[in-house]
Amino acid sequence: MEVHVCSVGTSLLKNSLDDDNVRKEIERLGLKDWDRLKFDDDRQNRIKENFDSLRKMLLKFIRSKGRRASAELDSLFSTFEKLKHNKSEIYVFLYSTNTSNSQLAGEVIRDYLIEEGIRSELVTVKTISSEENFYEGIVDLFDKVIYRILKFKEQDNEVYINATPGLKPESIFLTLAGLLAGADLIYYKYQEFNDVVILPSPPITIRPKYLDWLIRFAISGYTLSEKRAEELGIPVRLLEAKMLVERKGEDAYRLKDWVRKLLGIYLPIGAQNKYYRVIVEGEGERTFDNEVEAYNYMESKRKEGKNVRVEVPDRVYFLGL
């Protein structure tokens, strides 16, 4: 099976405005620039309220225009032809953001592909709307897209990433992470000369020394004190400079969530640390494999007036007096 992974932008919405009937309806709904709406624009709700009628209208538009209706369809069908892929062997894995305009475009494109005899699936990922939630969006991309690429490869499918549509920061990250996950080919359709270009898609991996440090970190606990990291030979300050770990409190470091997801490509399920570590100021640390025992010990030290830090498999707590 040839799996094409493709993000969904809003070119369909923009192009549909060239149709007089569509444009009049969109203007009537007060959605003139509906392809450029921000995630928090109140008009997203208007799209949601009229979702079914808009979906039917756009599907009719696509049927009349075919692949020219959107960047997704144009690049996909051009690549099917260039690579001589048979419809019966194609599976298109689409992903849109969780905004109403992107979801609308995604559903219509998926439905059209199915009408054309091409198996297709659509998933929704979180919108990246600011620097603050960038990494949250990347984590969601791992959960819903990158791990699916891994699964497709485990099932001996060929995986092709369409880098043409969608938002560029996510497309760049998807391309890199997709290659790490074993994607076979990256392609892009240049509108300037109306042709699909197969991009260099070398097998890539994390530098061995960084991978060793990160795996050692993950197996030892997703949060480590600086002292413990030094004992393990992990240069946490270098990893912090590379934005792979983040500082928690004065002397603790934690793997960033997206790095934990990235390590899922390399670590088997269950390889992460499951211990509970309690660090008491002035007394060192103790490790427990039972949450109740760790909690009881922590409480006893806290009642003694000690500052306590508790590290559990996926987070860290600081408890004062």
Curated annotation (Swiss-Prot):
CRISPR (clustered regularly interspaced short palindromic repeat) is an adaptive immune system that provides protection against mobile genetic elements (viruses, transposable elements and conjugative plasmids). CRISPR clusters contain spacers, sequences complementary to antecedent mobile elements, and target invading nucleic acids. CRISPR clusters are transcribed and processed into CRISPR RNA (crRNA). A nuclease that degrades cyclic oligoadenylates (cOA), second messengers that induce an antiviral state important for defense against invading nucleic acids. Changing residue 11 to A: 32-fold decrease in kcat for degradation of cA4. Belongs to the cOA ring nuclease family. The keyword Zinc does not apply. One of its GO terms (molecular function) is lyase activity. Homodimer. One of its GO terms (biological process) is defense response to virus. Its EC number is 4.6.1.-. It catalyses: cyclic tetraadenylate = 2 5'-hydroxy-diadenylate 2',3'-cylic phosphate. It comes from Saccharolobus solfataricus (strain ATCC 35092 / DSM 1617 / JCM 11322 / P2). The record marks 168 as: Transition state stabilizer. Its main location: cytoplasm. One of its GO terms (cellular component) is cytoplasm. Does not require a metal cofactor. The keyword Cytoplasm applies. Keywords: Antiviral defense, Cytoplasm, Lyase. This is CRISPR system ring nuclease SSO1393. InterPro entries: SSO1393, SSO1393-like, SSO1393-like_WHD. It is found in: Cytoplasm.
